[in-house]
């Protein structure tokens, strides 16, 4: 098993030194879901939310969050993102919306945290925009789905 990388030999928190790493293309995809009442999902999909186009605002929030990850997660490196893609998949049969975020860069460290932060903020934005009609919404299942690049190479969540 690997060791934790964000602690020194004394157990103090550190920012990992990436100076000796090569710049490589790095891609990470994360996903998560928000469960809601069927009526809430219907309002979102029908464009009937009082605050506007919920998914358009959540998409912009996700992109903005990926760019601000280092400001939110203390030991993350600021990363120059080259691409961010945000997708939403409504699942009416289970009354939820699945959000997937893919982040890319060419750099010395991965973009897993950026993708995970993007998903989290997108789902929080949906909650914020719809809480007036459904305070019982549940956010969950947030996880890394795939990462590529760097020393550890390619990893994919098992099916």
Swiss-Prot record:
State whether keyword Lyase applies.
yes
A Gene Ontology biological process term: Mo-molybdopterin cofactor biosynthetic process
Q: Which GO terms describe its molecular function?
A: cyclic pyranopterin monophosphate synthase activity
SUPFAM superfamilies cross-referenced by the UniProt entry? Molybdenum cofactor biosynthesis protein C, MoaC
Q: Which keywords accompany this UniProt record?
A: Lyase, Molybdenum cofactor biosynthesis
A Pfam match: MoaC
InterPro entries associated with the record:
MoaC (IPR023045), MoaC_bact/euk (IPR047594), MoaC_sf (IPR036522), MoCo_biosynth_MoaA/MoaC (IPR050105), Mopterin_CF_biosynth-C_dom (IPR002820)
Q: Which family does it belong to?
A: Belongs to the MoaC family.
> What is this protein's function per UniProt?
Catalyzes the conversion of (8S)-3',8-cyclo-7,8-dihydroguanosine 5'-triphosphate to cyclic pyranopterin monophosphate (cPMP).
Q: How does it assemble?
A: Homohexamer; trimer of dimers.
Which NCBIfam families does the record associate with it? Answer: moaC, PRK09364.1
Under which name does UniProt file this protein? Cyclic pyranopterin monophosphate synthase
What organism is listed for this UniProt entry? Thiobacillus denitrificans (strain ATCC 25259 / T1)
């Amino acid at each position: 098993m690997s060791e934790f990388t964000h602690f020194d030999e004394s157990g103090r928190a550190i920012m990992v030194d990436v100076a000796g790493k090569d710049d490589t293309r790095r891609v990470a995809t994360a996903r998560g879901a928000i469960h809601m009442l069927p009526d809430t999902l219907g309002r979102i999909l029908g464009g009937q939310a009082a605050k506007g186009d919920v998914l358009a605002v959540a998409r912009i929030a996700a992109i903005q969050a990926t760019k601000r990850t280092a400001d939110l997660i203390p030991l993350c490196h600021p990363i120059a993102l080259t691409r961010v893609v945000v997708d939403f998949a409504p699942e009416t049969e289970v009354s939820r919306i699945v959000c997937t975020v893919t982040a890319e860069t060419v750099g010395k460290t991965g973009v897993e945290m950026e993708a995970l932060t993007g998903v989290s903020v997108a789902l929080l934005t949906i909650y914020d925009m719809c809480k007036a009609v459904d305070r019982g919404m549940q956010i969950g299942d947030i996880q890394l789905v795939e990462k590529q690049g760097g020393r550890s190479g390619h990893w994919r969540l098992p099916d």
